[in-house]
């Protein structure tokens, strides 16, 4: 496969590009990763055993659980800050997580506000403070503003901070204004755990419409409609046809993407990070094969010479791609069947089921998996390089963390 990136349209808020020369499993893996697998700095407030937020005082109309949920939805732009430690942070799939956690443990979000006025007070991210536990002081507010930046409309200079909670004013001398006092540690996570941790507000793709074929089909339809419709009715029906039926006429293996970040990462960076995460996951799968962790067993469900390759903690993102590459590489000369399925969404594993023309050993199956993984890594390296040509190839080196990750992955 030779992926091609074309039709790049990069604006201040949105990135559009065309990915062609690849199967839909590649495009879908890229989209799934951008939507759910890109890690970022977060406020973890659920489940209760992992909650990092603490409320000392809350007299607002919202109880603590609602405020915790609202807190977890606030994006944290630590990558935009000038804190020196965060310059080199690359929150990868496996690497650097321990380093990131150690840095995040230094900081504590604090909020302490009381409404002493006679009108409702809006408590926003502008009121947030960040305490450096090692230095025993608060980081400067201009730095906090970079981490929790306001929204500035294109046509105005007004700054709009994210509203967290409203504090009602005091009613009498005996009934004071509402107060909120809380703190929270920083953590890291991805939208796979909770949708509030997503780094994109738009991430979609569709088949590239074959404009010439679609126009020819429309002219045929207009000619057909002319016998029973007026000119105005034909024009209206043509517009209606373009909304749906036109999109069914598309170029094979060509997809138009639209990506819109919530602001933590640049739009192009989101695409390249998705490529890097997929490459890391493929390397990790390859490492599991070399470490003899990959489980291969005889399949009881179909013909002889059939085997099930069990992928732990990998879903359609990796499994469908791997199945596709194995299929086009080895069918029908070596294999007579190659399929993929995750039996239930809650399962921690999925299955690639293969059937061979002749009996084979596990080592042969592993080598075929490794060959397919190498081909997929090359595809995503090329996609990444097409978006940022000046960057060197993304390098992944196994670390001591990988063994710990494998131990976690390959447990029932």
Name each model feature, range by range.
Residues 1-412:
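Protein-protein interaction/assembly regions in multi-subunit complexes
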């Amino acid at each position: 496969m030779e992926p091609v990136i074309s039709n790049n349209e990069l604006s201040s808020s949105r990135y559009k590009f065309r990915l062609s020369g690849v199967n839909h499993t590649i495009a879908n893996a890229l989209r799934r990763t951008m939507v759910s697998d890109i890690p970022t700095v977060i406020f973890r407030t659920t489940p209760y055993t992992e909650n990092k937020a603490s409320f000392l005082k809350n007299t607002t109309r919202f109880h603590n659980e609602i405020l915790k949920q609202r807190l977890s939805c606030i994006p944290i732009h630590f990558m935009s800050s000038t804190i020196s430690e965060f310059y080199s942070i690359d929150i990868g799939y496996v690497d650097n997580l321990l380093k990131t956690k150690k840095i995040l443990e230094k900081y504590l979000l604090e909020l302490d506000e009381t409404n002493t006025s006679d009108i409702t007070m809006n408590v926003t991210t502008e009121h947030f403070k960040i305490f450096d536990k090692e230095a025993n002081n608060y980081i400067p507010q201009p730095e906090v503003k970079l981490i929790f930046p306001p929204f500035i409309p294109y046509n105005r200079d007004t700054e709009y901070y994210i509203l967290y909670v409203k504090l009602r004013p005091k009613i009498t001398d005996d009934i004071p204004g509402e107060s909120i006092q809380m703190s929270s540690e920083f953590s890291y996570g991805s939208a796979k755990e909770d949708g509030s941790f997503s780094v994109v507000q738009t991430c979609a793709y569709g088949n590239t419409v074959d404009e010439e074929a679609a126009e020819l089909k429309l002219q045929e339809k207009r000619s057909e409609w002319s016998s029973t419709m007026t000119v105005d009715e034909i024009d209206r029906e043509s517009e209606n046809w373009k909304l749906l039926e036109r999109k069914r006429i598309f170029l094979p293996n060509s997809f138009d993407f639209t990506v819109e970040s919530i602001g933590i990462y640049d739009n192009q960076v989101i695409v390249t990070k998705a490529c890097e995460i997929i490459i890391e996951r493929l390397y990790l799968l390859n490492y599991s094969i070399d470490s003899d962790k990959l489980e291969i067993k005889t399949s009881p469900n179909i013909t002889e010479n059939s085997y099930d390759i069990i992928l732990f903690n990998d879903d359609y993102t990796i499994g469908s791609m791997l199945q596709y590459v194995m299929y086009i590489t080895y069918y029908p000369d070596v294999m007579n069947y190659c399929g993929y399925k995750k039996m239930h969404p809650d399962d921690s594993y999925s299955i690639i089921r293969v059937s061979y023309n002749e009996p084979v050993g596990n080592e042969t199956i592993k080598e075929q998996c490794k060959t397919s993984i190498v081909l997929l890594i090359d595809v995503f390296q090329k996609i990444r390089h097409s978006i940022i040509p000046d960057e060197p190839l993304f390098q992944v080196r196994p670390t001591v963390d990988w063994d710990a990750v494998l131990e976690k992955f390959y447990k029932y």
